[in-house]
Amino acid sequence: MNVAASQQPTPATVASRGRSAAPERMTGAKAIVRSLEELNADIVFGIPGGAVLPVYDPLYSSTKVRHVLVRHEQGAGHAATGYAQVTGRVGVCIATSGPGATNLVTPIADANLDSVPMVAITGQVGSGLLGTDAFQEADIRGITMPVTKHNFMVTNPNDIPQALAEAFHLAITGRPGPVLVDIPKDVQNAELDFVWPPKIDLPGYRPVSTPHARQIEQAVKLIGEAKKPVLYVGGGVIKADAHEELRAFAEYTGIPVVTTLMALGTFPESHELHMGMPGMHGTVSAVGALQRSDLLIAIGSRFDDRVTGDVDTFAPDAKIIHADIDPAEIGKIKQVEVPIVGDAREVLARLLETTKASKAETEDISEWVDYLKGLKARFPRGYDEQPGDLLAPQFVIETLSKEVGPDAIYCAGVGQHQMWAAQFVDFEKPRTWLNSGGLGTMGYAVPAALGAKAGAPDKEVWAIDGDGCFQMTNQELTTAAVEGFPIKIALINNGNLGMVRQWQTLFYEGRYSNTKLRNQGEYMPDFVTLSEGLGCVAIRVTKAEEVLPAIQKAREINDRPVVIDFIVGEDAQVWPMVSAGSSNSDIQYALGLRPFFDGDESAAEDPADIHEAVSDIDAAVESTEA
């Protein structure tokens, strides 16, 4: 369990408490609210409805639990995720039965793939109506079983405190994840003698946080023998609040670090050992580090297909140390030499401690580090200007990052804007980057930003969103306006489903089937008018010289949400890129430009063109440095 998570009770801490008061007679609905209060759930996101209405009466009276009324249950789920990602605490959402519950399925699945601690409480039709196809009946337990860490149906009102305490414990411990608690309406209305703390019993659930000493010793031995090691860092390091331990271990050993999309910020991007983000749209230096490594030290990462590319050709010469809190992840994709089950924070601390105590000689890896630094310098982040006066989206995001800085929280949905944000925002601190990494959910950014602001009200929160994603959940801007969450939206508006269009350009001969979202030259919808109608201040930007003043103006407004509609060129693309299913060794820095790794043959048709292009890049870098 991480430090932030320890602020919320677990069965161990709950069971150790004495009873503070005699049993109190109350309804199941009131027991739900009282349990949330005891579990320190300070905010919940939801929408009332018939099957959950009993809960909303005692919730109205609660002085400890704030309810945020969203405009769609998907917004409630993503807001709970945003809250959880920023705070490290359990995010809570509430919905009624049937369509209310099914509207939570997408954010639950999203939280499951990104290992987010969430508890979803759903109302259900009365027990006597179950299985009769009653009005607004849906088997939400069956529907969500594949995408939850666990789920419950409470059939006895006396079990409500236990079920909720167990749900919170399951959500936050071990590998975090979503837990659903489904409660029929008659159980909410029935009475019980409320007793806290409840008796808790989770047979077979014993997550391991402390790594085995022998595995740590084996890992340290491999690390000492490696000539080209790399720390492959995933989101589990952020979940464990292990950023300080990671930095200490990397600096002591001098091992270069790559951070996945879900781990951005856990290791400062400005650090000389940081080689960037690996994966389909990662940096050449990060991809090269993995491909040419002789030892991968994978901490809290799951070898996602977007990182590995073609698994058979991924890191072909590397031995693997894989440390993860979830034993099911170890060896799932790649065979490993040293499996380590444990919390990332404890694993890194033990690795450092054992490394310092080791008397064995270690290899000099300075040449390896210099090689990767050379790749990083030769292939820096960059972009092409758009034709005419059209804005380059990368310029917008780069300007935003420079102006707002690394203390803010940045959220993104999925698509080109997500990748540009990952590339052009400078992440220096953990829990400052929220995105839908595993499920790739359009519409994630706005409600997640709302939840992030709820969890960190003193932080500046920016949602970097695309116009396609924005049209799915922009109604939550009204929630933000009414509830007092002054988030900022940087809307990257290219009038298209940008990532789909990019693939159609590259792989479908430019046949743009159903990707254009508006007619050329029209503002449809007019996001300025729309946003103002939703309770926001709205600004439209069409020229480069307007970008910075608009961002500065947005930062001055803190009494309502602000939307900046950046009109950008539709032909901007995300580079570098590894085509789906291809080897990471075939990464393209730009279209047709495949870098060399260690002098290997290029996959390009004409190596001479590659050399010329690389020379031009080198000259440009030298000119910039001069």
Swiss-Prot record:
Segments of skewed composition (Polar residues): 1-13
The UniProt record lists the keyword Amino-acid biosynthesis: yes
Keyword list, A-Z: Amino-acid biosynthesis, Branched-chain amino acid biosynthesis, FAD, Flavoprotein, Magnesium, Metal-binding, Thiamine pyrophosphate, Transferase
Record protein name field: Acetolactate synthase large subunit
Cofactor field: Mg(2+); thiamine diphosphate
Alphabetical list of InterPro entries matching this protein: Acetolactate_synth_lsu, AHAS_TPP, DHS-like_NAD/FAD-binding_dom, THDP-binding, Thiamin_PyroP_enz_cen_dom, Thiamin_PyroP_enz_TPP-bd_dom, TPP-bd_CS, TPP_enz
Name of the gene this protein is made from: ilvB
Disulfide feature: none
Species the sequence originates in: Corynebacterium glutamicum (strain ATCC 13032 / DSM 20300 / JCM 1318 / BCRC 11384 / CCUG 27702 / LMG 3730 / NBRC 12168 / NCIMB 10025 / NRRL B-2784 / 534)
Residue numbers binding Mg(2+): 467, 494
Single GO MF descriptor: acetolactate synthase activity
Binding site for thiamine diphosphate: 73
Membrane-spanning intervals of the chain: none
E.C. number(s) listed in UniProt: 2.2.1.6
Cofactor: record remark: Binds 1 Mg(2+) ion per subunit.
Family listed: Belongs to the TPP enzyme family.
